[in-house]
Amino acid sequence: MEVDFSNSSKEEIRFFYQTISHNVKKYRLEKGLSQEKIALDIGIKSIAFYSNCENNRYDKHFNLEHLYKISKSLDIDLSLLLKR
């Protein structure tokens, strides 16, 4: 029997990542920037990887360093990317 010691369900974590992905895309589109522009700004050479993170595909997601750099590239407060 597997014991789960986590204080968050898998669904909560999935929703958390979806929220971040949604916010990144929303603010990027508001600024009129391409995925390629942001990916290159934050040092990601694979546009496909960036796209997978932004669209929450294949269990790919941004890490904290990515989010920090994205917030700088978009000239927004980092907390906006985390809000529900």
Segment roles from a protein language model:
Residues L74-R84:
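Short C-terminal boundary/hinge segments that cap the last helix of small helical domains
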Residues V24, I38-A39, F49-C53, L81:
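Conserved hydrophobic/aromatic packing and binding residues within compact polymer-binding modules
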